[in-house]
């Protein structure tokens, strides 16, 4: 995108490349991430506590977590629906309306659809059987097993209006793509959820999931916002998804 620069971070355990593109008059921010181990893909909560009344800016949470790159999560503190797994524990079970995205210890993304997990016991067994470390519940699923999804109605995210969007996708084993679509400069077009699916599908991502959008849609790279959040400012929120280096702090900072 005119006027933007490519940013990157690289060490022996992680490669991150961030860039912007103007697509159909939308400002699209992308971050490609490759990691050495699934443990480098993590979730952080504001105040490091589930259910805390403390909301924080994503840059603060990313800094506290020593994140190389981060994207907003599902903003679980703003709603009461969905399934929340954090550090392998089930904290919220209200699955009847949202598709969920689970993250395994090996770094894979696994989707569930409405009606697949109907009891807390089923969720706990699913977590154990698949070695789940955390989950997010926003959605919908944008791409699944290489098939682009079409969503016309959904409980959250105002899917049928033009809106800022955020998404996370898994390209391959330990290989991911983050995406944010916002208004920036002369690029004024926000997108519907199906247009967001088109954009990440066009990047060759076989599995992708929508995160909270609007002003929440934020990517943090090297400690600073990389995209332009709505109204030009970060908003306080409750959670981020982030990638960390596996090198100890002193080595990574040298």
Where are the predicted features?
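Zymogen propeptides
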Residues: 1-100, 108-111
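Short, solvent-exposed aromatic-acidic interface loops
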Residues: 45-52, 115-119, 181-185
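A short, polar/proline- and glycine-enriched secondary-structure boundary/capping micro-motif
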Residues: 52-55, 119-126, 187-194
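Short hydrophobic-aromatic micro-motifs
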Residues: 69, 109-111, 142-144, 150, ...
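Conserved, well-ordered active-site substructure
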Residues: 80-105, 151-206, 211, 216-254
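Extended Lys/Arg-rich, glycine-bearing segments that form polyanion-binding/interaction patches
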Residues: 94, 98-132
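Short, conserved active-site entrance elements at the starts or edges of catalytic domains
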Residues: 132-155
């Amino acid at each position: 995108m005119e006027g933007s620069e490519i940013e990157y971070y690289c060490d022996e355990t992680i490669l991150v490349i961030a860039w912007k593109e103007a697509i159909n008059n939308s400002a699209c921010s992308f971050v490609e991430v490759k990691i050495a181990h699934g443990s480098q893909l993590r979730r952080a909560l504001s105040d490091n506590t589930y259910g805390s009344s403390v909301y924080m800016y994503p840059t603060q949470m990313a800094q506290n977590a020593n994140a190389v790159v981060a994207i907003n999560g599902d903003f679980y503190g703003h709603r009461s629906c969905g399934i929340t797994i954090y550090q392998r524990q089930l904290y919220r079970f209200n699955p009847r309306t949202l598709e969920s995205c689970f993250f395994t210890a090996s770094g894979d993304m696994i989707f569930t659809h409405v009606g697949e997990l109907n009891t807390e016991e089923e969720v706990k067994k699913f977590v154990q059987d698949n070695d789940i470390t955390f989950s997010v519940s926003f959605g919908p699923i944008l791409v699944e097993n290489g098939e682009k999804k079409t969503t016309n109605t959904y409980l959250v995210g105002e899917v049928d209006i033009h809106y800022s969007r955020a998404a996370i996708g898994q390209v391959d084993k330990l290989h991911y793509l983050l995406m944010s679509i916002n208004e920036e400069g002369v690029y004024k077009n926000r997108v519907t959820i199906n247009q967001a699916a088109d954009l990440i599908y066009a990047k060759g991502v076989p599995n992708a999931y929508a995160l909270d959008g609007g002003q929440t849609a934020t990517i943090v790279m090297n400690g600073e916002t990389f995209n332009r959040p709505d109204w030009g400012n970060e908003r306080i929120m409750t959670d981020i998804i982030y990638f960390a280096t596996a090198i100890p702090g002193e080595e990574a900072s040298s």
